[in-house]
Design a protein with these regions (language model features):
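Pre-Walker A (Motif I) flank of P-loop NTPase domains
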Residues: 1-3, 69
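Hydrophobic anchor at the beta1->P-loop junction of P-loop NTPases
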Residues: 6
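P-loop (Walker A) phosphate-binding loop of NTP-binding proteins
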Residues: 9
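Conserved lysine of the Walker
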Residues: 14
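Conserved substrate/cofactor phosphate-moiety recognition/catalytic segment
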Residues: 19-62, 164
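Active-site flanking residues adjacent to catalytic metal/cofactor-binding acidic residues
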Residues: 31, 74-76, 111
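Conserved nucleotide-sensing/catalytic segment adjacent to the nucleotide-binding pocket
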Residues: 44-90
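A glycine- and Lys/Arg-enriched "phosphate-lid" helix/loop adjacent to the NTP-binding pocket
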Residues: 89-159, 172
Length: 173
């Protein structure tokens, strides 16, 4: 089983690319639990919600891992929960990082916020490119610090599609 994670700031194409990859390569796609959580609770999140959101994301991931697909595509993982918690609330539950480091991921596709427009969808909150660049930089710094396999994805939508497909194709060879 190969596990690919789409990482990076909001509105950089993670969900779109995850769907494109799954449609082309097959496997199982795990979505963002936080979106489900917000829809179910009909409110913004607060710091006290972070453990439930992170555990929900882990549960979805673990259910998919148990099926042992050849390819598991994660629209997000605990890094996003960890960084959003720090961004929005200045802190995060201490167990998130060790739990993230305890898991194996074969490839992180880290999407840059540059060269694509921000799109409001009712849940996004970083319309300014500078904020999304800070989130991208924090993601990259964490992945590099912890020697996680990553491929930075840049450019317009077509370029992102090509880069992501090539990276996953190489992983599956």
């Amino acid at each position: 089983m190969k596990v690919v994670v789409l990482a990076g700031p909001e509105s950089s194409g993670k969900s779109w690319l995850a769907e494109q990859l799954q449609a082309h390569f097959g496997g199982i796609l795990v979505g963002e639990y936080v979106r489900y959580f917000i829809e179910q609770n009909a409110r913004d999140t607060c710091f006290d919600d972070i453990p439930a959101i992170a555990r929900g994301q882990l549960d979805w991931e673990d259910q998919a891992r148990a099926l042992r697909p050849l390819l598991l595509i994660l629209d997000t993982h605990l890094l996003s929960n960890m960084l959003w918690s720090k961004t929005l609330f200045g802190d995060c539950p201490p167990w998130l990082e060790p739990e993230l480091l305890n898991r194996h991921y074969d490839l992180h596709l880290l999407l840059s916020p540059d060269d694509v427009e921000w799109t409001q969808d009712g849940q996004r909150c970083q319309p300014f490119l500078a904020d999304r660049q800070l989130f991208f930089n924090a993601s990259r710094q964490w992945l590099e610090l912890h020697q996680q396999p990553l491929q930075v994805i840049t450019g317009d939508w077509h370029a992102r599609h090509l880069q992501a497909f090539n990276a996953v194709k190489q992983l599956l060879v």
